[in-house]
Regions:
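Substrate-binding/catalytic cleft of secreted carbohydrate-active enzymes
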Residues: 62-67, 74-194
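Secreted/periplasmic carbohydrate-active enzymes, especially glycoside hydrolases
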Residues: 1-94, 120-121, 135-136, 152, ...
Length: 194
């Protein structure tokens, strides 16, 4: 990707993209034409290591995220805020899907807090929209109002209209409000786990 000003290149960066086809319809999720069931982890966005902390090399992110893949997970639902670029790139490399939140609290919010959440969602979508591993944008850790869900979907539709990504919120099962329920909790409960 090249940034040009007045026809002259001023900055350049390698932009990697990947391709996949998704469909969220009729109560099913399809990836590349095949029905799948999300199964995986709700991971802290910091994804830190004991005694090392957050600043880990890329290979350690690949190793850590690879452990989830090796345990038969196919999705990571990051907690509360968008992950750092290194983890997004890692999941792109190893082929693990992710649900990306923008920023939330344990409930729907109003006023300036909601406006901030929308701003963070917009910025995260713009920054990560070329990452094929992101299959879902999460509006909140808990359900949000119908109006708020519509606003998040409008942000997605404006800044990532062809990305094939769902928009949803954890603990919000109304099909009329969202594309997919983001909570892995329901998969686990349906399998007899609590």
């Amino acid at each position: 990707t090249t940034l040009t000003i007045n026809g002259k290149p001023t900055d350049k960066v390698v932009t990697r993209t990947g391709f996949r086809q998704t469909e969220f319809a009729n109560g099913m999720v399809k990836l590349n034409g095949r029905v799948i069931q999300f199964k995986g982890y709700a991971q802290r966005t910091s994804n830190e290591w004991p005694a090392i902390g957050l600043s880990v090399p890329a290979w350690l992110s690949d190793y850590s995220n690879g452990q989830m893949l090796a345990s038969n997970a196919n999705l990571v639902r990051w907690m509360h805020t968008a992950p750092w670029k290194q983890d997004v790139d890692s999941l792109d490399r190893i082929g693990l899907m992710q649900a990306m939140p923008a920023g939330d609290s344990e409930a729907d919010v109003t006023g300036r807090r909601w406006e901030q959440r929308k701003e963070v969602m917009r910025d995260a979508i713009i920054y990560f929209r070329t990452s094929p591993s992101i299959v879902m944008y999460e509006a909140g850790n808990r359900g949000v109002s119908a109006e708020h869900m519509a606003e998040v979907k409008a942000i997605r539709d404006r800044y990532d209209p062809h990305g094939g990504r769902a928009a949803g919120s954890r603990e919000m099962l109304s099909k009329a409000l969202q594309d997919v329920a983001a909570g892995l909790i329901y998969v686990l409960a349906g399998a007899g786990f609590s």
